[in-house]
A protein has these predicted regions:
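Subset of outer-membrane beta-barrel
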Residues: 3-296
Length: 296
């Protein structure tokens, strides 16, 4: 994850649904709201939602680097919601080498950890959110930083051939904040802010069948070692609000392009989503994602 980025955890996926739908965090988000789109939670008739996810890449000789996410959403008043979450990335074990090239009796276990807070507000067709994160990264020594983001969504409807289409537009500016600073060495590494834009179209064929099309683009706003431009497209078929089938594609200049396949289901407030991302370049890897949650 995170080629060229001083915080690889930022490149991890937090939602199995989002990951396979072109990696687009759009207005139609259904889970992991703090990391996908907090304003989308206010469109649901829910007071609380708790979600957890895990991203599983292939195992390497040094171990398997797993990415965990846990988040909760609370609508404490009409059109207002608070969010809390945490992300954790670890699993690799690296042997230390001495100056003579031989192993020494010390092992490095790198990890990344964040704690995150967010707030969202909705009025008529508009939604607004802000969030902040504390990031800690440890390799040989520990580094930390604080990052912030904000976004806006617009939701409305139109009619196409007598069918209702729900559409949404979403924009986010994220990763704005201080450089990553390592305490012991006082070395600093700039974090590049990003801009994300997306559009969602959900066609209700009838009461049982819906199709959702997502289009998105993103990129860094400042020059740096992790410069990238990305675009994605996703298609989701929903049956009777119980079963979802998903297909998506995303391309990023810094990483390989990927094909996403996914399935999800929900019943009695419980949802479970599986996603598989197939890397389409010789140097890329395939990853499995699982997201589960409960709404009440």
């Amino acid at each position: 994850m995170g080629q060229g980025s001083p915080l690889p955890l930022l490149e991890g996926n937090t939602s199995a649904r989002t990951a396979v739908l072109g990696n687009i965090r759009g207005a139609s988000a259904k889970d992991m709201f703090l990391y996908t789109n907090p304003t989308a939670f206010l469109t649901k008739e829910a007071t609380f939602q708790v979600d957890a996810s895990i991203e599983i890449p292939p195992k390497l000789p040094e171990g398997r680097e797993l990415f965990y996410t846990l988040t909760g959403a609370w609508s404490f008043a009409t059109s207002h919601a608070l969010f809390v979450g945490a992300r954790y990335n670890a699993g690799v074990k690296v042997d230390m080498m001495g100056s003579d090239g031989n192993k020494v009796d010390k092992v490095i276990r790198p990890y990344d950890l964040t704690t995150d807070l967010g707030y969202a507000y909705a009025v008529e067709h508009w939604g607004f959110f802000a969030r902040g994160s504390y990031h800690r990264r440890k390799v040989l020594v520990e580094g930390e930083t604080y990052l912030f983001g904000a976004g806006i969504s617009y939701l409305n409807q139109y009619t196409l051939f007598g069918k209702v289409v729900d559409f949404g537009l979403h924009a986010t500016v994220d990763r704005v904040g201080a450089p990553l600073r390592y305490r012991a060495s006082n070395d600093t590494y700039a974090i590049q802010p990003i801009l994300e834009l997306s559009a969602d179209q959900c066609l209700s064929i009838n009461e049982q069948h819906q199709l959702t099309l997502l289009l998105g683009a993103s990129g860094t706003l400042k020059e740096g070692p992790a410069n990238y431009r990305a675009a994605g497209v996703g298609l989701e078929y929903s049956y009777n609000k119980l079963l979802d089938l998903r297909l998506g594609y995303d391309y990023q200049t810094l990483r390989s392009h990927t094909l996403g396949l996914g399935i999800g289901g929900q019943l009695y407030g419980i949802h479970l989503d599986l996603g598989y991302r197939l890397g389409l370049a010789s140097y890329s890897v395939n990853t499995l994602m699982v997201t589960a949650g409960y709404t009440f």
